[in-house]
Each structure stands twice: as structure tokens, then as C-alpha cells.
């Protein structure tokens, strides 16, 4: 008898943010001590960001990821011994190796299953979700923990007004479980390696020394132009694969990069802004954590409900992008 195909369904979500909240006014005051001028009005007008959470010294990506994972597991009602795969999307791992996923596995007391990291910057969570979905569909996993976690504050040049105001730290997670009915309907992943220089942190560690530029650098205008183009096309492609129209989407949860990008994308897709989940005003850009954090907020406040159609999108350095369409 032919084995029935299993699908991956979101069974629970969780988010975790560092305790320290830094408002735009707080940040402006700190930057002013170094003769760098900015203001709450300047930041909000250009980005939509009002505050961000920053990890204290000594707090690691794996710690944030573990807390988000525990909340997602509680929400899903699963125990550590049920988790047979952990994927962490991060660009700010604790170590060169072992992977952050292995550290999370140990923290949770999960044993024996696969654990590895995915590095696709702000697209990382979408890449990780798609990877876990493929494992579950292939029958190679039944209960996967997918996490996006970052401490981007560690790789920012705090003398660069154009980037240091944009980012925050945090972690978000989902539990994907094998199900008879589709949860994840379709997913598309893409990259264009010729665009590496528009968003990168090009430093590396060799022979005990940091070589190159260790800080995040970004060409904001180029990122905007690329992001709105590829996300629009990706959304239409993933909907077409699933046999639905963009109008059928109940919620759009894009990477929380910049309110201008989100508003422009919503207009191109003709998705009303009231159906776009926006959290960057409170979280700033948390890179791979932004989509799962936004999903968790919208699930817990009752906006995202079971049975609804949710489109999640990531876009980031590489240049990478992707979309996941899921029935909740």
C-alpha cells in the first residue's frame, strides 16, 4: 500500500525579546554623545521604527532562541523528546561551530534528532521553514522546531546613523508537525549572489584575527528597489503554485525591514494595509527573527486564526528572498 503523504502544519509559535528597550529618543541621546545627529521624528518618518530591544552584554543568540523555542513548544503542547529536528536561522551565531541549533538542542534536553543552522540573513526563517517542510513531506521528520534568532546589535557600526537605528535583537520560533491536511501549501526560495555588496557584513576570522570589515553595511536604496521587486514576484509565484489568488490571502507577514518597503509591497499586491502584520515599530528589524516574531504576535492577539491563509516573506543579504504560504 502506498504511504500517504504527510504535510507540515504550524502547531505552535513563540517569541522572545531581550528585556532592555531602547526608544528612538534613548538612541538619539546616546548617539548625540558621539556628535551623531538623529531624532525620533527622523527615524519614524524613514523607517516606522519607534523602539527596539537590545541584548545585554553576555546574552547570546542561543539563549534568545531557547526561550522562544520553549514558548513555541508550550503553545504546541509538545515535549523535548518529541522534537526530531531543530533548525536555527541566524547570521549571529554564538560560535563559528558548533551550530546554534546544537546549543538549543542541549538547552532543551532534546536528543538524537538533526540540529543545524541556516544562514540566509533576513530570509533565514523562510529558508528554514521550507527546509523543515521538505523533511516532513519526505517522511524524514515528524516534529520540527524552526527558529529565527539574532543579536544584530553585535555587528552594527554604532557610528553609522544609516544602519544602527534600524535593527534590534530577538527570537521567534514555530513548531511544525506532520499532518494529514496541508499546512504549508507552497514555498519558493531564491538568491542572486551577484548582489552581495548591497547588504553584507564582510569580515571574517582567520588565524585569531578579524580581517575585513566586521560591521553590517547596506546600500539602502538598492535594497529597497530589489526587495519590492522580488517580493512582489515571489508572492504571485507562490500563490499560483498553491492555486490561490493574492486576494485570497488573509494575512501578509513580510520581513519587518522598513515600513516604506511594506507599504509599497502591499500596494503592488493590492493587499489592504489592515491585512499586513507590522511589528517593526516595536521590534525594529530583527533579521531572521522578524517573521516568526510577527507571526507569534498576530496569533496571540487573535488576528491570525486557524484556517486562515498566511503569506510569510523574507528578503535579505545574499541577496536572498523567499515566500511561504500556509494554512493555519
UniProtKB/Swiss-Prot annotation:
PANTHER family: 3-OXOACYL-[ACYL-CARRIER-PROTEIN] SYNTHASE 3, BETA-KETOACYL-[ACYL-CARRIER-PROTEIN] SYNTHASE III. Keywords: Acyltransferase, Cytoplasm, Fatty acid biosynthesis, Fatty acid metabolism, Lipid biosynthesis, Lipid metabolism, Multifunctional enzyme, Transferase. Pathway: Lipid metabolism; fatty acid biosynthesis. Its EC number is 2.3.1.180. The keyword Nucleotide-binding does not apply. The last Arg residue of the ACP-binding site is essential for the weak association between ACP/AcpP and FabH. Catalyzes the condensation reaction of fatty acid synthesis by the addition to an acyl acceptor of two carbons from malonyl-ACP. Catalyzes the first condensation reaction which initiates fatty acid synthesis and may therefore play a role in governing the total rate of fatty acid production. Possesses both acetoacetyl-ACP synthase and acetyl transacylase activities. Its substrate specificity determines the biosynthesis of branched-chain and/or straight-chain of fatty acids. Pfam families: ACP_syn_III, ACP_syn_III_C. It is found in: Cytoplasm. Residues 256-260 are annotated as: ACP-binding. SUPFAM superfamilies: Thiolase-like. Homodimer. InterPro entries: ACP_syn_III_C, ACP_syn_III_N, FabH, Thiolase-like. This is Beta-ketoacyl-[acyl-carrier-protein] synthase III. Disulfide bonds: none annotated. The gene is fabH. It is an enzyme of class 2 (transferase). It comes from the Bacteria. NCBIfam families: fabH, PRK09352.1. GO terms for biological process: fatty acid biosynthetic process; secondary metabolite biosynthetic process.
Amino acid at each position: 500500500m502506498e504511504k500517504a503523504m504527510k504535510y507540515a502544519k504550524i502547531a505552535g509559535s513563540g517569541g522572545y525579546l531581550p528585556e532592555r528597550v531602547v526608544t528612538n529618543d534613548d538612541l538619539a541621546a546616546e548617539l548625540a554623545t558621539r556628535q551623531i545627529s538623529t531624532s525620533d521624528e527622523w527615524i519614524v518618518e524613514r523607517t516606522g521604527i519607534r523602539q527596539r530591544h537590545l541584548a545585554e552584554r553576555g546574552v547570546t543568540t542561543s539563549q534568545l532562541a531557547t526561550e522562544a523555542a520553549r514558548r513555541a513548544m508550550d503553545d504546541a503542547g509538545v515535549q523535548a523528546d518529541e522534537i526530531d529536528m531543530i533548525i536555527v536561522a541566524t547570521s549571529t551565531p554564538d560560535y563559528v561551530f558548533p551550530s546554534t541549533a546544537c546549543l538549543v538542542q542541549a538547552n532543551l534536553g532534546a536528543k538524537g534528532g538533526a540540529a543545524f543552522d541556516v544562514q540566509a540573513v533576513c530570509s533565514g526563517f523562510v529558508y528554514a521553514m521550507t527546509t523543515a517542510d521538505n523533511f516532513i513531506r519526505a517522511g524524514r521528520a515528524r516534529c520540527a522546531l524552526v527558529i529565527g534568532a539574532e543579536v544584530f546589535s553585535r555587528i552594527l557600526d554604532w557610528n553609522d546613523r544609516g544602519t544602527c537605528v534600524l535593527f534590534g535583537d530577538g527570537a521567534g520560533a514555530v513548531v511544525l508537525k506532520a499532518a494529514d491536511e496541508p499546512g504549508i501549501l507552497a514555498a519558493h526560495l531564491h538568491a542572486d549572489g551577484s548582489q552581495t555588496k548591497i547588504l553584507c557584513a564582510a569580515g571574517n576570522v582567520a588565524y585569531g584575527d578579524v580581517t575585513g570589515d566586521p560591521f553590517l553595511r547596506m546600500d539602502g536604496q538598492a535594497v529597497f528597489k530589489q526587495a519590492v521587486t522580488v517580493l512582489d514576484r515571489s508572492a504571485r509565484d507562490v500563490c499560483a503554485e498553491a492555486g490561490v489568488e493574492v486576494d485570497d490571502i488573509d494575512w501578509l507577514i513580510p520581513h519587518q525591514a522598513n515600513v516604506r518597503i511594506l507599504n509599497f509591497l502591499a500596494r503592488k499586491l493590492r493587499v489592504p494595509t489592515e491585512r499586513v502584520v507590522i511589528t517593526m515599530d516595536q521590534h525594529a528589524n530583527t533579521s531572521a527573527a522578524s517573521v516568526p516574531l510577527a507571526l507569534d504576535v498576530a496569533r496571540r492577539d487573535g488576528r491570525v486564526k486557524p484556517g486562515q491563509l498566511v503569506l510569510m516573506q523574507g528578503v535579505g543579504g545574499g541577496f536572498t528572498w523567499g515566500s511561504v504560504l500556509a494554512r493555519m
